[in-house]
UniProtKB/Swiss-Prot annotation:
Residues reported to bind 5-phospho-alpha-D-ribose 1-diphosphate: 107-108, 111, 113, 133-141
Protein role: Catalyzes the transfer of a ribosyl phosphate group from 5-phosphoribose 1-diphosphate to orotate, leading to the formation of orotidine monophosphate (OMP).
Protein's name according to its UniProt entry: Orotate phosphoribosyltransferase
Protein keywords: Glycosyltransferase, Magnesium, Pyrimidine biosynthesis, Transferase
Domain of life: Bacteria
Source organism (scientific name): Rhizobium johnstonii (strain DSM 114642 / LMG 32736 / 3841) (Rhizobium leguminosarum bv. viciae)
Organismal lineage: Bacteria, Pseudomonadati, Pseudomonadota, Alphaproteobacteria, Hyphomicrobiales
InterPro entries per UniProt: OPRT, Or_phspho_trans_dom, PRibTrfase_dom, PRTase-like
EC number: 2.4.2.10
Gene that specifies this protein: pyrE
Family, as annotated: Belongs to the purine/pyrimidine phosphoribosyltransferase family. PyrE subfamily.
Transmembrane segments annotated in the record for this chain: none
């Protein structure tokens, strides 16, 4: 089903943030920080994979993703949708179905046997590929998949993350010649927390300290204090 409605961006961001709270996908633990794929320590973590277990929410989020892409990228800009191992794969399948496009998936590394393939599915050379991930912090993991697709002859000018941490600029994407699309950020989640009083004052203060200076917070709490972008 092709998307034909285009909700306001702020409404989509707020609703996704509320959905994440509703399904208990927002986690906080400053005493034992979460380790992100970037190596950063974080007092907060979003489990976007939980979205898959709630059909009404899952469908709405795919509506939001399709709306975002069609409005901001265009209706005929992609030949296929790619999901990265592992969290991006189910979302790629859902979005490809929503946009009536083929789907491929990309392994973190070649599987080491058989065809030794890193990309699974049909991707003719020159295909314009959209890469989707459930979330991204600074783009490091997404670019592993983008680089593999480009090496195999695909063209990647766009990526989408359902949730973007929003704590860094998008320089990595600009440098890699990829436009990043996203629906919500931590600021949206925090706004809902304040509105509905879901965090106490101490927790709010700790989360805001992280969002305002993420690498400094990470370095003080056992994570990396700089990123290679």
């Amino acid at each position: 089903m092709i998307q034909t409605t285009f909700p306001d961006r702020a409404v989509m961001a707020e609703l996704l943030a509320k959905m994440l709270w509703e399904i208990k996908a927002v986690h906080f633990n400053a005493a034992q920080p979460y380790k992100l794929s970037s190596g950063m320590a974080s007092p907060v973590y979003i489990d976007c994979r939980k979205l898959l277990s709630f059909p009404r929410i899952r469908s709405t989020v795919m509506d939001f993703a399709a709306s975002t892409l069609l409005r901001d990228a265009g209706f005929e800009q992609f030949d296929c949708i790619a999901g990265g191992e592992t969290a991006g794969i189910p979302f790629a399948a859902l979005l490809a179905d929503r946009l009536s496009l083929p789907m491929i998936y990309v392994r973190k590394q070649p599987k080491g046997h058989g065809r030794n393939a890193q990309i699974e599915g049909n991707m003719p050379e020159g295909s314009r590929v959209l890469v989707i991930e459930d979330l991204t912090t600074a783009g490091g993991s997404m670019f592993k998949f983008i680089d593999a697709i480009r090496a195999a002859g695909g063209i990647v000018d766009h990526g989408i993350a359902l949730f973007f941490y929003g704590i860094f600029g998008e320089e990595r994407f600009a440098d890699g010649k990829v436009r990043l699309h996203h629906i919500a950020t931590w600021r949206n989640v925090l706004a809902v927390a304040k509105e509905q009083k879901l965090f106490d004052d101490k927790t709010l203060s700790e989360v805001e300290a992280f969002l305002d200076a993420p690498l400094a917070w990470s370095g003080r709490n056992g994570g990396v204090s700089e990123l290679s972008l």
